Amino acid sequence: MSILVRFPASNVSKQQYDTVRDNLTGAGDWPPDGCELHVAFGPDDDIRVSEVWQTADKFRSFGDKLRPQLEQAGIQLAGEPEVFDDVHVVETL
């Protein structure tokens, strides 16, 4: 069963978000294995991210690659991401 993850970051700029994504892409870590859906939204000075993952293990594995990129871009999380178990995903496209 999938999990939903919401990241507790605020005041993340679009530039910071793009930097992290570009660095992960350059390292061959984007898109991450096991991520079913990635949604980045909000105004350019307050980007929020939510994701749906196949398993918690795949999310944790990606977290080991993500953390250094967040730190390098100056993004600080206000705690651990919220994780919701047993998410049902319906694809309508």
Language model: regions and residue ranges:
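Short S/T/G/P-rich N-terminal loop/turn motif that feeds into the first structured element of a domain
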Residues: 1-50, 54-68, 75-93
